[in-house]
Amino acid sequence: MASASVPAAGYGADGVYRSLRPPAPVASDPGLSLTDLLLRRADACPSAVALADAAAGGRALTFAELRSAVLSTAVALSSRAGVRPGDAVLLLAPNCVLYPVCFFAVTALGAVGTTVNPDYTPREIAKQVSDARAKLVITISALVPKIAGLRLPVILLDDDANAAAASLPPDATVTLYTNLVAGVKEADYRRPPIKQSDTAALLYSSGTTGDSKGVILTHRNFIAAARMVTSDQDERREGPNVFLCFLPMFHIFGLSVITYAQLHRGNAIIAMSRFDINSLMEAVQRHRVTHLFCVPPVIIALAKHGKAGKYDLSSLKFIGSGAAPLGKDVMEVVAKKFPDSEIVQGYGMTETCGIISLEYPEKGQAREFGSTGTLVSGVEAKIVDIKTLKHLPPNQVGEICVRGPNVMQGYFNNVQATEFTIKQGWLHTGDLGYFDGGGQLFVVDRLKELIKYKGFQIAPAELEGLLLSHPEILDAVVIPFPDAKAGEVPIAYVVRSPDSSLTEVDVQKFIEKQVAYYKRLKRVTFVGSVPKSASGKILRRQLIAQVRSSKL
């Protein structure tokens, strides 16, 4: 039974926390696609800059040009590449102007965009392609060697077809993007029947249960998240803002919270292909960037960078951070260095299209370090006791559960994981947290055992599976270890077979060949056994506690 309501926290007598923000209704038209909503902006501000590459002399598109590019690309994908409603199209590329153009073109056809990390190995990419059932790859020539074994048609966003051909079988189908869209007219676009409830994207996340799974996100999920993310700007009647996007567009935050949400409002997106702190500051200066979403290591770099004074960063008025809490000392240093900027933290996950809560300091709330802000409009939450599932009032820690129009439909082709995560309409995040008396959400721990390296999630189960595939390894466990720059790094405790002469370097190289750089083991320790319960479950938290207290 729920306790008495606490209106100041948004906590009702039914045990549900509701947003303290004004309502931000989602478009009611069931036939509205995310691309439809986006392209309305071309009618409202056709000559305003929509997208631009961060580097000097890079490509740029106005909203009118964005509309033309999206629809022309959609026509070409349909008529020349055979993309049909429901087909999955894989995007494998760094951030660039053409990345969102292609994603929006895919969704304009009623097809499904599935994104993948360019740092993935061929094995990891092939696994996702197989699971998503992708029929086409959009990429750049430098990444073609990673997909050479897939035998799928390839569209190259750059013009280096010769380099790409050298890595592909002789009978491979390779088309330059410029050739694909040559002579195509946006007027030839014929919109297929698309509903808000149709799948728009399949983004892969380790989620709440470990192994990577395809998160099914609909047009409605993107539309709802866009309203949630931008409603504060609307309430303050802000003019168009300029957002720098260096967080990867293959990730839900870069794709949904930054790129789609801000474009739908009429804000400009500056696409940065690779993060470098000096390049970031140059881009802020060159494009007069107003809004910067970061992860904690970048915030720390900004706070400590000795050359920040060389650049004119006065245009910045908003610095947002997610993925992990910012320490009070870091927040204070950044606030001093950027006195005219709001320093804001938020919380979200792929399964919620990137957003759950966000700080809004201007609302007069007392600033609480470690808070991820209040629920965005339209999201409801409950905190449940992990043993009894009882709803908990403010200032009591339990599992964070949420529901709202931004919540995923489930995991692709994985009923078991879906039923484990979504129960009676509530998404169980796997995170422990609480709301204070003012409705601010604090995330204090993780039920799930993911390792957070900067903005990336690493599933220990994946690395453990690879370790156990080695013929000389009998048992293994992977846990997070604190790191000042990355937040957490993966380390392993390994049980060797009796006659093995494996070294730490041997194990690290074995893993390095099979995973993206951020999943590489930073340390390997050989032990006689892995601590487990009577039922055989790894006592991971016990091991983490021992390691951090230097007892192991």
Swiss-Prot record:
- Which parts of the sequence bind (E)-4-coumaroyl-AMP? 253, 323, 345-346, 350, 448, 452
Required co-factor? Mg(2+)
Q: Which of UniProt's keywords are assigned here?
A: ATP-binding, Ligase, Magnesium, Nucleotide-binding
Q: Domain of life here?
A: Eukaryota
Its job: Carboxylate--CoA ligase that may use 4-coumarate as substrate. Follows a two-step reaction mechanism, wherein the carboxylate substrate first undergoes adenylation by ATP, followed by a thioesterification in the presence of CoA to yield the final CoA thioester.
User: Can you tell me which residues bind ATP?
Assistant: 205-209, 213, 345-346, 350, 431, 446, 537
Q: Name one GO molecular function term.
A: 4-coumarate-CoA ligase activity
Residue numbers binding CoA: 274, 454-455
The alphabetized list of GO BP terms reads: phenylpropanoid metabolic process
Stretch list, region SBD1: 276-345
Protein name, per record: 4-coumarate--CoA ligase-like 1
The cross-references to Pfam families, in alphabetical order and at most eight, read: AMP-binding, AMP-binding_C
Q: Which reaction does it catalyse?
A: (E)-4-coumarate + ATP + CoA = (E)-4-coumaroyl-CoA + AMP + diphosphate; (E)-4-coumarate + ATP + H(+) = (E)-4-coumaroyl-AMP + diphosphate; (E)-4-coumaroyl-AMP + CoA = (E)-4-coumaroyl-CoA + AMP + H(+)
**Domain commentary:** Both substrate-binding domains (SBD1 and SBD2) are involved in the substrate recognition, and are sufficient to confer the substrate specificity.
Q: Which PANTHER family does the annotation name?
A: 4-COUMARATE--COA LIGASE-LIKE 7, LONG-CHAIN-FATTY-ACID--COA LIGASE
Is ATP-binding one of the keywords? yes
Q: Which family does it belong to?
A: Belongs to the ATP-dependent AMP-binding enzyme family.
Where is the segment annotated SBD2?
346-411
Q: Which organism is it from?
A: Oryza sativa subsp. japonica
